[in-house]
């Protein structure tokens, strides 16, 4: 009796290639996410530095302005 090859091995190879591509895409996403995180961290640090500078120069005026705008 003759046996027939269903080509299942080839499908396994294709699935493996798909998994490799998926992992590579996830790696790119992680890299993009890391870059965004670093950029946002830099922006936040810059903003905090600017606030510190304003407070060092005229903290009393800053507080008066805050209270006048409804702050407590």
Curated annotation (Swiss-Prot):
Pfam families: Pup. Protein modifier that is covalently attached to lysine residues of substrate proteins, thereby targeting them for proteasomal degradation. The tagging system is termed pupylation. Residues 21-61 form a coiled coil. GO terms for biological process: modification-dependent protein catabolic process; proteasomal protein catabolic process; protein pupylation. Pathway: Protein degradation; proteasomal Pup-dependent pathway. The gene is pup. It comes from Frankia alni (strain DSM 45986 / CECT 9034 / ACN14a). Residues 1-10 have a biased composition (Gly residues). Residues 1-41 are annotated as: Disordered. The keyword Secreted does not apply. Keywords: Coiled coil, Isopeptide bond, Ubl conjugation pathway. This is Prokaryotic ubiquitin-like protein Pup. Residues 31-41 have a biased composition (Basic and acidic residues). Belongs to the prokaryotic ubiquitin-like protein family. There is a cross-link at residue 72 (Isoglutamyl lysine isopeptide (Glu-Lys) (interchain with K-? in acceptor proteins)). The N-terminal unstructured half of Pup provides a signal required to initiate unfolding and degradation by the proteasome but is not needed for pupylation, while the C-terminal helical half of Pup interacts with ARC to target proteins to the proteasome. One of its GO terms (molecular function) is proteasome binding. Strongly interacts with the proteasome-associated ATPase ARC through a hydrophobic interface; the interacting region of Pup lies in its C-terminal half. There is one Pup binding site per ARC hexamer ring. It comes from the Bacteria. InterPro entries: Ubiquitin-like_Pup (IPR008515). HAMAP family: Pup. Residues 28-66 are annotated as: ARC ATPase binding.
């Amino acid at each position: 009796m003759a046996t027939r090859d269903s080509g299942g091995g080839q499908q396994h190879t294709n699935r493996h290639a798909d998994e490799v591509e998926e992992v590579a895409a996830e790696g790119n996403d992680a890299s993009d996410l890391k870059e965004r995180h670093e950029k946002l961290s830099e922006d936040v640090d810059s903003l905090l530095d600017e606030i510190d500078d304003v407070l060092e120069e005229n903290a009393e005026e800053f507080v008066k302005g805050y209270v006048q705008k409804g702050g407590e």
